């Protein structure tokens, strides 16, 4: 069992902050919509009075709704059950507001059938719903987050190899659990950040700016080196080969209909490039948007590093102050070193059928 410092128990930034800064995830979701439409055609032929759809890793729900609508439009069933799940630390208040407002708007208008909504505070690396109870499951922009950071081995095995092994175990665990939950003939749709076959580093500008800002804070004595050493975002970007190796273990359980890689650009870059010669104000606005996007994911891990690296030596107010310093300096480094640079990311997309 991993100790608490290695467990991935940090939620996305709460109080609507993550949902307000998830534009790249939205772009990635749009590329997955054809997979949902294909899965919906299969579900439409299911002879059942109740159809159950489960999302694994809903966060605040803002990128859950268009996939749900793509499915609901094609399902002529008597009742629909939508289940939104995430880790217990997730901001379920924001998720509830997002989903409820959306459901209230479509029931009786676009949707005539009863709609039943549930939220489940449970990691998708555990069983989330009863066996053979779901007709379609999906997870978007979440599965690159690992269950935990693997601890160093006595033989000094390379960290990247340990992360790759953990990512293999985690994806296999996820697929095994979902195979128990999804009925035969049901579908599973996945998208997650991947290692680009083209060789570029995902969102390299923001990542480097974050790193340099933290190094400067250490050099200036703002934070001790132990905090920087404790900072970890427990993710691994799988290659297509990594994914295929896992899928080879499930040939008797899952049929692969789609498996491909695609590039996703942060939409703020397109808005910036509409201007032939962006103003300094536009460049600063772009930096604000892309760094706030990254911080919506990473800020909680910085706060955790402050707690672990200082052994609880900071007050809540001091943690918030240091976080703000890090965010501000990251934006300054991005403007200095990566002004107007594209923010691009590779995603892997998968559509599976339960055999």
Swiss-Prot record:
UniProt note: phenotype after gene disruption: Accumulates carboxy-fusarins.
Binding site for Mg(2+): 231
Family from the record: Belongs to the methyltransferase superfamily. Type-7 methyltransferase family.
Ligand binding (S-adenosyl-L-homocysteine): 18, 63, 86, 123-124
SUPFAM superfamilies according to UniProt: S-adenosyl-L-methionine-dependent methyltransferases (SSF53335)
Pfam families hit by this protein: Methyltransf_7
Keywords tagged on the record: Magnesium, Metal-binding, Methyltransferase, S-adenosyl-L-methionine, Transferase
Cofactor(s) this protein cannot do without: Mg(2+)
One Gene Ontology biological process: methylation
Organism, as annotated: Gibberella fujikuroi (strain CBS 195.34 / IMI 58289 / NRRL A-6831)
Protein name: Methyltransferase FUS9
UniProt entry tagged with the keyword Nucleotide-binding: no
Residues making up the signal peptide according to the UniProt record: none
Enzyme class (EC, first level): transferase
Cofactor note: Binds 1 Mg(2+) ion per subunit.
Induction: Expressed under high amounts of nitrogen via regulation by GLN1. Moreover, components of the fungal-specific velvet complex VEL1, VEL2 and LAE1 act also as positive regulators of expression. Finally, expression is induced under acidic conditions in a PACC-independent manner.
GO molecular function, one term: metal ion binding
Protein purpose: Methyltransferase; part of the gene cluster that mediates the biosynthesis of the mycotoxin fusarin C. Within the cluster, FUS1, FUS2, FUS8 and FUS9 are sufficient for fusarin production. The roles of the other FUS members are yet undetermined. The fusarin C synthetase FUS1 is responsible for the condensation of one acetyl-coenzyme A (CoA) unit with six malonyl-CoA units and the amide linkage of the arising heptaketide and homoserine, subsequently releasing the first intermediate, prefusarin, as an alcohol with an open ring structure.
Pathways per UniProt: Mycotoxin biosynthesis
Xref: InterPro entries: MeTrfase_7, MeTrfase_capping, SAM-dependent_MTases_sf
EC number(s) on file: 2.1.1.-
Gene that this sequence comes from: FUS9
